[in-house]
Design a protein with these regions (language model features):
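Residues at the starts of beta-strands that form the adenosine-phosphate
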Residues: 28-31, 76, 113, 152
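Short, hinge-like loop/turn segments at secondary-structure boundaries
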Residues: 48-51, 78, 132-134
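Conserved P-loop
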Residues: 2-72
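Helix-adjacent hinge/juxtasegments
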Residues: 54-100
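Residue-level signal for inorganic ion chemistry
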Residues: 17, 50, 79, 119, ...
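Short, flexible active-site-adjacent loop segments at beta-strand->alpha-helix junctions, enriched
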Residues: 36, 64, 83-84, 120-121, ...
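Structural beta-sheet core signal
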Residues: 32-34, 80, 116, 155
């Protein structure tokens, strides 16, 4: 089963997704695919919070770019934290949008149980630069693709989740 947790920054989506997959996995230790790359001290601090929270509850894999290739190797439930940062990394490495969406589509066809975390950035103001607008547009397309393929979708805000699908 594929499940999407989508919400704004600091909405609680990561914590809710982690609790959800741990509950669903029951006896299996789920994989935690961390897609973030460290570019500054502030991002390192955010990553540290996530690492401390998950402790040894997950088998952690850090891979910022090769999502499909990495997920093919997982033999159990997996949490992808987060699709938004993976999209950011793809744009940083100048991967064409069509290739990015094709890879995400392939990920969604994998048969493993998967929980995807994604930032809802389309509710914000229109960005003032081309790259930021490109990211927001790509993020929206990715969210629609995940929404279509996931059996469950939760919108997160204020530390709460609302089932959308």
């Amino acid at each position: 089963m594929k499940t999407l947790f989508i919400g704004g920054i600091k909405s609680g989506k990561s914590r809710l997704a982690e609790a959800y997959i741990l509950e669903q996995a029951a006896t299996d230790k789920p994989y935690y695919l961390a897609t973030n790359e460290v570019f500054d001290d502030e991002m390192q601090a955010r990553i540290r919070v996530h690492q401390q929270r998950r402790e040894d509850l997950f088998v952690t894999i850090e891979e910022p770019v090769k999502l499909f290739e990495t997920l093919q190797k997982c033999r159990g439930p997996v949490l992808v934290e987060c699709v938004s940062m993976w999209l950011n990394n793809q744009l940083y490495y100048q991967i064409p949008e069509a290739d990015i969406l094709q890879e995400l589509g392939a990920v969604l066809q994998l048969t493993c149980d998967m929980v995807l975390v994604h930032n809802e950035v389309g509710l914000s103001v229109i960005a003032d630069n081309r790259l930021a607008r490109q990211f927001v547009d790509l993020s929206g397309k990715a969210a629609q693709l995940m929404g279509q393929h996931c059996e469950q979708v939760f919108f997160c805000s204020a530390g709460l989740k609302i089932k959308m699908k």
